[in-house]
From Swiss-Prot:
The chain crosses the membrane at residues 36-56, 70-92, 113-135, 156-176, 192-212, 236-256. NCBIfam families: MIP (TIGR00861). It is found in: Cell membrane. This is Probable aquaporin PIP2-8. Expressed in leaves and at lower levels in roots. The keyword Transmembrane helix applies. A motif (NPA 1) lies at residues 96-98. The keyword Repeat applies. Residues 1-21 are annotated as: Disordered. Aquaporins contain two tandem repeats each containing three membrane-spanning domains and a pore-forming loop with the signature motif Asn-Pro-Ala (NPA).
């Protein structure tokens, strides 16, 4: 046990990880990086395949005991909980380019890792949507919109961007809070405590935003079904930009709020620079 440096001191029982380098060429030769990318690909494939199948199934059974909005929300939230629990120790369990983007801004992952993750997530999402299409058949898949995200009638593009931004803010803020080094040190004996709030955040965001955008909050999840449904020919494709702009803006805002306001990184940096500067 580390001793305090002075009487009455209360040393931290955790240690903040060092910031990741923006470019770490050394990790490019490590199998662990590619194993993590494979985990991101597989997890995103499963996420999109199962969640999109739930949406299509609900539309097919509408009025006949379909899952409904609550069932879809539980499918997404529960699946995120399971997949984060399974992959967090390998890749961090991002499954979402917006989450990966926020981690780059927070200096938790390097740019090469983020680029590889994002590529794996997008390819996994396309493969997951393709698998869902194979499960339901091309006709049923197209007839029920392929589970793709699109702006609901009566809502403006601006409203869609705001909904996606707010929803992603909630998700990424929860991710940062659940994986905070201080909380991880305190709750390390209960390994489900990080995936659980993340899954619940996804659930409640779906309840709030399904009526507006169908809930994207994940650019890869929106890209996969839109591509499989038809490149450049569908409403989902024309609305796709909403599901990239909103989530990336929300992710950046959540990182700034958690890292610089709640964690006080800006104040610490200012205090450190003031301490090092000469005084006259």
């Amino acid at each position: 046990m580390a001793a305090g440096s002075g009487s009455g001191s209360n040393p931290k029982d955790y240690q903040d990880p060092p910031p990741a380098p923006l470019v770490d060429t050394g990790e490019l030769g490590k199998w662990s990086l590619y194993r993590a990318a494979i985990a991101e690909f597989t997890a995103t494939l499963l996420l999109v395949c199962i969640s999109v199948s739930t949406v299509i199934g609900e539309k097919r059974q509408s009025g006949e005991g379909g899952a409904g909005v609550l069932g879809i929300a539980w499918a997404f939230g529960g699946l995120i909980f399971v997949l984060v629990y399974c992959t967090a120790g390998i890749s961090g369990g991002h499954m979402n380019p917006a989450v990966t983007f926020a981690m780059v801004l927070a200096r938790r992952v390097s740019l090469p890792r983020a680029a590889l993750y994002t590529m794996a997530q997008c390819v996994g999402a396309v493969c997951g949507a393709g698998l869902a299409r194979a499960m339901h058949g091309g006709g049923q898949y197209a007839r029920h919109g392929g589970g793709a995200n699109e702006l609901a009638a009566g809502y403006s593009a601006g409203a869609g961007v705001v909904a996606e931004m707010v929803g992603t803010f909630v998700l990424v803020y929860t991710v940062f809070s659940a994986t905070d080094p201080k909380r991880k040190a305190r709750d390390s004996h209960v390994p489900v405590l990080a995936p659980l709030p993340i899954g619940l955040a996804v659930l409640v965001v779906h309840l709030a935003t399904i009526p507006i955008t169908g809930t994207g909050i994940n650019p890869a999840r929106s890209l996969g079904p839109a591509l499989v449904l038809g490149l450049g020919t569908t409403k989902a494709w024309s609305h796709l930009w909403i599901f990239w702009v909103g989530p990336f803006a929300g992710a950046a805002a959540a990182m700034i709020y958690h890292h610089y306001i709640l964690r006080g990184a800006a104040a610490k940096a200012f205090a450190s620079s003031s301490y090092r500067s000469p005084h006259f």
